[in-house]
Design a protein with these regions (language model features):
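A cross-family glycoside hydrolase active-site/sugar-binding cleft signature
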Residues: 14-16, 55-59, 79, 107-111, ...
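Solvent-exposed beta-hairpin/edge-strand motifs
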Residues: 251-276
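Aromatic/acidic polysaccharide-binding cleft in carbohydrate-active enzymes
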Residues: 17, 98-189, 219, 231
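Carbohydrate-binding surface patches
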Residues: 200-260, 301
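C-terminal beta-strand-rich structural cap/linker in extracellular carbohydrate-active enzymes
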Residues: 285-307
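Active-site neighborhood of glycoside hydrolase catalytic domains
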Residues: 1-75, 81-92
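Conserved, mostly hydrophobic/aromatic
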Residues: 16, 74, 133, 225, ...
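Acidic-and-aromatic substrate-binding clefts and catalytic sites of carbohydrate-active enzymes
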Residues: 60-66, 80-90, 114-123, 149-151, ...
Length: 307
């Protein structure tokens, strides 16, 4: 560790592991507690180089509590596999990990189209997964020299289409522009959201097929509603293993009713249109409820209600 930093000006160290291997033993036949070993290893590395950053991969969340509990890593980092393949897992894992250390953000290593034999990533699958991750406040480790499709990072069998290259920039611009709204701590809200369109069902988190799923959070006095389009989705797995997630149809002029009083302003923004720029909406206050119309929803539209 010291020799590496003496020769190379790295910012820090990425510590990896291979996940839960059941009972393991040392050379002398004594049983090992790997997760406790992770924590002591991190702490000793930090003590030797206090100014260097550390992160450790919790493969399938193995050891995540011990890793986070050291408070010596820069963020919560989980590599997800088949046991954590549901969209709903993305929020539950993040909440669990942040219960161990609520000062750190969650980053997922999550490989898209893992079993696909195609030559390109499936754009709808990638964008829907990123939409969900970003909406809940997590990040996706997916870009380097190329987009990752495999735990072996040099694997570049799948390429990004021109459409995906363009869209992914909009998504990361959006995530950066609105990071305080997306990442600041808040309280999840489960109040019903009423649709004025009989053909569109609004479903509160967790995601459900054939619906628009809403993830709602109170952040710094604002009510933030993320609309996620699962109307045409063919699976509730973020992995899109064979690259078959269909492109959603854009829903235009979606009338909604939300429980919210003393509303001062409502605006929407989406990485799918207008470069993520905010659009202020007209609204109608009716007692404890407010009615308004969302201009469009493709993958993800964020609604901000200011009170």
């Amino acid at each position: 560790n010291d020799d590496v930093y003496a020769s190379l000006d790295f910012d820090g160290y990425h510590i990896d592991q291979v996940g839960d291997r059941g009972n393991v033993y040392d050379y002398y036949g004594s049983k090992l507690n790997l997760v406790d070993g992770f924590a002591s290893f991190i702490k000793k590395m930090k003590m030797r180089q206090l100014n260097k950053s550390l992160v450790m991969n919790a493969v399938a969340n193995f050891g995540s509590q011990q890793i986070a509990g050291t408070r010596d890593v820069d963020f919560l980092y989980s590599e997800l596999w088949s046991g954590e393949s549901a969209f709903s897992d993305l929020l539950s894992i993040m909440k669990t990990n942040q219960s161990y250390n609520d000062s750190l953000a969650q980053v997922y290593a999550a490989y898209m189209d893992y079993n696909s034999s195609k030559s390109e990533f499936n754009t709808p699958g990638v964008l829907l997964t990123d939409a969900v991750m970003f909406a809940i406040g997590a990040d996706h480790l997916e870009l380097g020299d190329h987009m990752l499709c495999n735990e072996y990072f040099p694997n570049s069998n799948l390429k990004m289409s021109d459409a995906l290259k363009t869209a992914i920039v909009h998504y990361y611009d959006f995530f950066t522009a609105y990071e305080n709204i997306l990442r600041d701590k808040g309280t999840q809200n489960y109040d019903a959201i009423y649709s004025g369109n009989s053909s569109v069902i609004i479903n509160n988190w967790p995601p459900k097929l054939n619906t628009v799923t809403a993830y709602t959070k109170e952040v710094n006095g604002k009510e933030i509603i993320h609309l996620l389009n699962f109307v045409k989705a063919n699976s509730l797995s973020w992995r899109d293993l064979d690259g078959s997630m269909p492109e959603p149809e854009t829903i235009n002029s979606l009338s909604l009713g939300v429980r919210a009083s003393s509303v001062k302003k409502i605006w929407v923004a989406s990485p799918d249109c207008y470069g993520g720029a905010p659009q202020e909406l007209h609204f109608r206050q009716q007692g404890d409820y407010v009615a308004f119309t969302v201009p469009s929803l493709k993958y993800w539209t964020m609604i901000v209600i200011e009170k």
